[in-house]
């Protein structure tokens, strides 16, 4: 049986990139389950436990804004690094003057969510690991604002603030909206085969401001 926790997260901007918009990025309407998992793993991660997202409460209304950002159009390939390591004489850097390109991004602004999640023990837990120990560490970190690395909303430049949520009744911006279909969204990545990592999707339906992920159908 998993051990549950509620975490409030908020920030100025978020970008949960849609895979079909590869050049000029556009965000999903709400946070993806994989982004929520990433935030919790930034607070606490251990090989002996696994996070699972139960619900995402959309506290603030969905608002978009468009910005233009400087990006680079190329990347350093692992094969190039290996060649240089083996003695090849070739540059191993990206010239921003030559590769810089300005691209538009459709971001979410003024975001706030409450993540309901639980963790489960894995086969990599040792004899000193137990749910009580992990929960004490997680609760202490959430109350103190401590993290392994700074959590973010989709992209590292969009910092996520976080704290423990101890409210029983969580108000959302869509309490009066019975149901809203958000279409297909990224659920997470399937890492079971490291040589063929596959995306998983689900049909996102927000009911009164809440995405319930406990029994959703996942499509590979």
Which sequence ranges carry the predicted segments?
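Internal, well-folded beta-alpha domain core
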Residues: 71, 81-220
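Residue-level detector of short, conserved catalytic/binding motifs and their immediate flanks
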Residues: 5, 54, 113
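Glycine/small-residue-rich interface belts in oligomeric ring/scaffold proteins
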Residues: 21, 26-71
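Beta-strand elements of well-folded, non-transmembrane domains
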Residues: 9-13, 60, 115-123
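A short, structural micro-pattern
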Residues: 1, 50, 107-111
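Residue-level signal for secondary-structure boundary sites
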Residues: 15-17, 64, 123-125
